[in-house]
A protein has these predicted regions:
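Phosphate-coordination/substrate-recognition cap region in phosphate-metabolizing enzymes
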Residues: 2-19, 23-24, 62-129, 211
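Generic beta-sheet signal
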Residues: 29, 167-175
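Loop-to-helix element that buttresses phosphate recognition and phosphoryl-transfer chemistry
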Residues: 29-31, 36-90, 142-154
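Short glycine-enriched, charge-decorated loop/helix-capping segments at active-site entrances
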Residues: 44-52, 115-117, 189-190, 230
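Glycine-rich phosphate-binding loop signature in dinucleotide/nucleotide-binding domains
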Residues: 69-71, 160-167
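Short glycine/proline- and acidic residue-enriched helix-loop micro-motifs
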Residues: 126-148
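Domain-level recognition of soluble alpha/beta enzyme cores
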Residues: 188-212
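Acidic, His/Gly-rich catalytic cores of divalent-metal-dependent hydrolytic chemistry
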Residues: 214-233
Length: 233
């Protein structure tokens, strides 16, 4: 583990140092959603394992430059091509290797993994009602399910953090994975509470089994990319 010191900052921080994990001892976790893929643009909905688009490759390059400034120690990623390609750009910028982790995969949503529009109309209406009223992965027929997804997301992140205490760790995953884990950290019942943008960074600190959300859906590194081409519309 590298030795780091933090600037003293606001004196009020002394009151929240332990509660909010302020200081250099906590593990820094950077949850990154993969950059724009051909699945996101509709170019490849069939394979389930789409490559990045040209825009996505530029987003990934910018992620690498941004995270290099954080002096990251390790880069983990789900095994799918869109996450591996994003993670490779981040790792290359910092002279690191990508560590694949199967349990970082996307939440399995059954028919919705392909095209929920293929469901009968009554079934689609039922799914829509459950999404609004309950907001959990249980709304999707044939899905992995909320409890299973939450346990998987929680356990794999705990495993990664426990293996590298005090380090700065990048985890490249998927939108539903990030939504689920943030919901767990915040102690919420709903599984999806925000939309993680492509190539966004959600920062979490961890220590002694506790997790504190520090920053959510950060895309400052995408400034200047036009809406529809990697920027936010």
């Amino acid at each position: 583990m590298k030795s780091r010191t933090d600037p003293p900052g606001d004196p009020i921080n002394v009151y929240f140092r332990e509660a909010l994990l302020i200081g250099g001892e906590a593990t820094r976790l950077y949850l990154v959603r993969h950059a724009q893929s051909q699945g996101n643009t509709g170019e490849d909905l069939a394979s389930g394992d789409a490559d990045l688009t040209e825009v996505g490759r530029e987003q990934a390059r910018r992620l690498g430059e941004r995270l290099k400034t954080q002096k990251i120690d390790r880069v983990y990623a789900s095994p799918l091509r869109r996450t591996q390609q994003t993670a490779s750009a981040i790792a290359d910028a910092s002279g690191l290797d990508v560590i694949p982790k199967a349990d970082l995969r996307e939440v399995q949503l059954g028919q919705a993994d392909y095209d929920i529009r293929l469901l009968p109309e009554k079934e689609r209406q039922k799914v829509a009602r459950l999404i609004m009223s309950e907001g959990t992965w249980d709304a999707f027929p044939g899905s992995e399910g909320s409890e299973t997804a939450r346990n998987r997301c929680r356990n794999v992140i705990k495993e990664i953090v426990n293996d590298h205490p005090g380090e700065r760790l990048v985890v490249v995953a998927h939108a539903a994975f990030i939504q689920t884990f943030v919901s767990v950290v915040l102690g919420l019942q709903r599984d999806f509470i925000f939309y993680p943008f492509n190539a966004s960074i959600t920062s979490i600190r961890a220590k002694d089994g506790r997790f504190v959300l520090w920053r959510m859906n950060d895309i400052a590194h995408l400034d200047g990319m036009p809406a529809g081409f990697g920027g936010i519309s």
